[in-house]
Design a protein with these regions (language model features):
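Conserved N-terminal phosphate-binding loop of PLP-dependent enzymes in the Aspartate aminotransferase
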Residues: 1-178
């Protein structure tokens, strides 16, 4: 299972744990390195033992800075209950976006994704471009797809500010259509 985006963000077990998928192999990255290049492949004992009988090459196999970064990430992850934090602030963002989507049907259809990474599904592509541009003009990078990730840096105050800015932009777009 590809857990590049979901691994660690949704807890130690990732999406496969949250949704009950059986996995023989798992791939982790991105969040594990917190910006440093790293990827991890894990699997069942039988699969991982089979790997020991073959030769695997990696361009970055001797790059130890990323391993140190991953070690630090895992320490912070456990100490700060990162997945729990992401779930709380993500739910706040998701529910706020849902209120916006429910109010402005001429601009948005719904909030989509999951709390940890969600987006507003606009009525059409042109509207999503206008939403992203309006948010950028407000100093907010708000992507048009499910890559609006919450992070450990997001607090309730930060999320409320995001929702205010997005809400103002959506309100302005709706007013232009009236």
């Amino acid at each position: 299972i590809d857990e590049i985006k979901t691994g660690l963000r949704l807890g130690w077990q990732g999406a496969s744990g949250r949704y009950g998928f059986h996995r023989d192999l798992i791939v982790l990255g991105k969040a594990l390195g917190n910006g440093f290049p790293i990827a991890v492949v894990g699997g069942s004992r039988a699969i991982m033992e089979a790997v020991t009988r073959t030769w695997i090459s990696s361009t970055l196999a001797t790059e130890f800075v990323s391993l140190a970064a991953a070690d630090a990430v895992l320490q912070v992850y456990e100490r700060e209950n990162v997945a729990g934090h992401l779930a709380v602030v993500g739910r706040r963002l998701y529910e706020g976006l849902d209120r916006i989507a429910s109010t402005y049907h001429t601009v948005t259809r719904a909030v989509k994704g999951i709390p940890e990474f969600c987006y507003l599904d606009c009525v059409d592509d042109a509207m999503s471009v206008r939403l992203a541009g309006g948010c950028a003009a407000q100093g907010l990078i708000f992507k048009r797809d499910a890559y609006n990730f919450v992070s450990l840096a997001h607090t309730a105050t930060v999320v409320d500010d995001i929702l205010q800015r997005v809400g103002d932009v959506v309100d302005s777009l709706a007013s232009q259509l009236a």
